Amino acid sequence: MSLKSRIRNSDFVALLNWQEDDGKGRRCMLLSAFLSTIVSSISTGALYTAFLASHDFSIVDTSFLGIIPSLAACFCVLSPVFLERFQKRRWLLAGGKLASYLLNLLCLTLLAVFVKDPRTRLVGFSAILLTSNLVNSLFSSGYSVWHLNFIPAKLRARYFSYQQIITTSATLLSLFLFGFLADALKGTTYEATVLTAMRFVALGFALLDVVILCLPKEYPYPKTEKSIRLVNIIRLPLRHKKFLMTILLISMWNFAASFSASSWTFHLLHNIGAGVTMTNLFSVFTIICLFTAPYWRRLIDKLSWFRTFAYCAMLHAPTMLLLAFVLPENYIWLYPLATFIQAFAGVGLNLSWANMPYINTPKEDQTYYLSFHTVISSLGSFLGSTAGAMFVRVFDRMEITVLGRHFDTAPMMLFVQFGLYVVCIVYVLLNDRRLQPKE
């Protein structure tokens, strides 16, 4: 078979299906995933931390700001009360996403540049960041409900694996282009200027993302509840035990994952001496390990979404212990080793994780269920970030000694994070059968 015929008959081309509206919807979703990942790579993570540091934000400030997005996401509880009043939501959702992008990428950037007083800047930054994320939380579940029509259950494993390839490629592209530049200018008088300019580049990609998301067909939104009430966000999910158990797992994992996130990145950049590019080796290794995605899909079919997730988490969790021993003199080899293990396990972990919000979600009234998912999962992230920030405040400048090695705050957090991941793994293994969706 010729290469052209293989491409024409491939799963990827079949998934995009140029003859159907659903195929167009998936194409737009994948392109949006590519664009939004570039935006996220610049406006969050290591480049975001470097941007804050270049404008004299401390590790305590960074930890505090890391709490705000997950706190704001908890307010998506108001989303269905607002969105369920509209059967056509395309332009409403686009307006909300545009406002969120402008606040995050334009207003925050200008404030950091022009406001020099540290206290005023932190207060203003917090207010704009909170508003931006509040707007996003109000509209994000609307996109999820709309786009879920394009990925029926039989296509999800394939769709999410290709989405993972695309988003990882976007992360790799953006972080290598912008990460190398940030590392080259680190410590120079141009560092803050270039990191600021990157956020305006991200704004351009964000505007294109808003346009792309307006293109798919919008289907009617099925619902069983005639009245639109806030209490339905709690009342409806309480009827579905499997859904609740799934959301509890998501919340627990988000708590664990958020515990050390911002502090660890700050520690790598400023205490270990790793550059932005080095801190994102995960993306390099992931793009290599993505060739194993078909095998992870087969494992999901053979075992289950949840058991695959648990086995991958068993590989991921011990890397926290490896990372805790990273030092300026050994990070060149130890950090890549831990990151490679994370990338290998991360393919299966992220593939199974992507379906978690949907696997046990009822087909009707999905705005309520997905809003409940966002609230509880965001609450887990918020509590994890808050616990991490409190840990930094309490143990800042303190050390413990293990096996003759002195650990300061950030490595100490990784020991705690390892324990939190173990709790999640045990939860899945004990409840695997009860978590399985009905056929």
Where do the protein language model's features map onto the residues?
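Transmembrane alpha-helix termini and helix-breaking/packing motifs in multi-pass membrane transporters
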Residues: 49-54, 81, 85, 108-116, ...
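Loop-to-transmembrane helix entry/capping segments in MFS-fold secondary transporters
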Residues: 59, 153-163, 275-276, 361-375
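Helix-loop boundary and gating motifs at the non-cytosolic
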Residues: 3-76, 80-83, 90-93, 105-108, ...
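C-terminal ends and interior cores of transmembrane alpha-helices
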Residues: 97-119, 314-330
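Intracellular loop-helix junctions on the cytosolic face of multi-pass helical membrane proteins
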Residues: 1-28, 116, 121-126, 130, ...
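Helix-to-loop junctions at the C-terminal end of transmembrane segments
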Residues: 75-91, 182, 292-305, 392
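Hydrophobic core of transmembrane alpha-helices in multi-pass small-molecule transporters
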Residues: 34, 103, 119-139, 332-349
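Cytoplasmic membrane-interface "Motif A"-like loop-to-helix N-cap segments
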Residues: 85-101, 190, 301-314
